[in-house]
Amino acid sequence: VTLQKFSSWTDLMDALNSGKIDGASVLVELAMGAVSNGIDLKAAALGHKDRNVVIVSDDISDVRDLKGKTFAIPSNQSSHNILLNDMLALGDLSIDDINVVQLAPSEMPSSLASGSIDGYCVAEPFGAQAVVQGYGHVLYDSTDLWQDSICCALVFNGGFLDKNKEAADEFLSTYKEAGSLLDEGIAKEVAEKYLGQDEKTLDVSLEWIHYDDLDISLDDYEQLSEKVKEYGINDNPPSYNDFIYQ
């Protein structure tokens, strides 16, 4: 397997949709949107389970304190957008009550530290980074807002699957097995190699996140589908059978 890094979701999705790459770890809503627009993609497994966090500056102690503030998410088509909407509802707020900006996850901790944003929702390790470095604190964990939430997924181009089903099945089996066997020590070694974070940040991050049971269940996907419709992210999400590789 050859790994290729992309600097933006747009570039990654263009490569995946066109078949320039065979598969990717991607925000699941982006892949759902592509399928709704006629692109042949299949989601095969989760990237991780739960534990996206809402990080806010120290002057914010309640969701209602976010009114009029600036909040960052990685993409409008993301579970982080869903979690933001779910959280705002707890304080009788709506998305119109705050200023939402899209930022690359790696830019979120420094933006919070500089005061250009007041909070963000993101996957690891960028939540732990702000906590460890003293830029902010956790207001909500995704499990508080949406149990068994789906965020990133391993997604294959349909053309690749048509021609390489046996190889894809072998890869997927090994991928899921790796998740079930992964302990914090091994995960930390891999994270140190690729993520460029300090040891304390990785220790905190790996306490929050887990990789066992990476199957995409029907119940969890149907809940996701309802939420993307509710919040205007995708009015016509693909069905489980059309989108989930089985």
Give the residues covered by each predicted segment.
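Secondary-structure end/capping motifs
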Residues: 162-235
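Short polybasic/polar patches that bind polyanions
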Residues: 35, 89, 131, 192-193, ...
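Short, glycine-/small- and polar/acidic-enriched structural segments
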Residues: 1-93, 100-102, 118-124, 135-139, ...
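Pocket-lining segment of extracytoplasmic ligand-binding domains
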Residues: 28-30, 101, 105-190
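Hinge/cleft segment of the Venus flytrap/periplasmic-binding protein
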Residues: 230, 236-246
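Solvent-exposed, polar/charged alpha-helical surfaces in well-ordered, non-transmembrane soluble domains
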Residues: 10, 14, 18, 32, ...
